[in-house]
Regions:
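One-carbon transfer enzymes
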Residues: 1-186
């Protein structure tokens, strides 16, 4: 059985999708780590009976408290699914090429600090792009600059808004993220 930990800061829709995709497979979500005590992912973790670890910025950034909690679960892969904090270099060193992220644009465009969710979608629409998409990549010490694993794109029309783009991106995430996790962990 392969073991994954999911890090999330928001609603947790990708985490739940991953859970359902792997329900009868040899991949198990052994824990969800969350940095936001008001995040929707907490309710999802409780409902799905997935162990939840809540942590604060100091424990994550300046101590090895979270590192030890992660190590206790013996993960084969750490999946960032809407997690908004930069991963400390010491954690990347503990899990080289074992931390992946999904980003809601075709990197290298619209990546970097502060570029997540609605901020990305608004920037894409304001730039009048004709396509957007998702990038799944390994995590390194720089925001959104790790080696790419996979990209998928969607076409945009002049009628698209940040909201309609978000819906298109969400469909791409649901369709591709679990399959790329499966390929990456094998």
């Amino acid at each position: 059985m392969k073991r994954i930990i999911i890090f999330a800061s928001g609603s947790g829709s990708n985490a739940e999708n991953i859970y359902h995709q792997f329900f009868n497979e040899n991949i198990e979500i052994v824990a969800i780590f969350c940095n936001n005590e008001k995040a929707g992912v907490i309710e999802r973790a409780n409902r799905l009976e997935i162990p939840l670890v809540l942590f604060n910025r100091n424990d994550f950034t300046n101590t090895d408290v979270v590192d030890k909690q992660i190590l206790s679960y013996k993960p084969d892969l750490i999946v960032l699914a809407g997690f908004l904090w930069k991963i400390p270099e010491r954690l990347i060193a503990l899990f080289p090429n074992k931390i992946i992220n999904i980003h809601p644009s075709l990197l290298p465009k619209y990546g970097g600090k502060g570029m997540y969710g609605h901020f990305v979608h608004e920037a894409v629409i304001n730039a009048k792009e004709t396509k957007s998409g998702i990038t799944i990549h390994y995590v390194n010490e720089h925001y959104d600059q790790g080696d790419y694993i996979f990209q998928a794109e969607c076409e945009l029309t002049p009628l698209d808004t940040a909201e309609t783009l978000a819906q298109k991106i969400h469909l791409l995430e649901f369709a591709h993220f679990p399959q790329i996790i499966k390929k990456t962990i094998q």
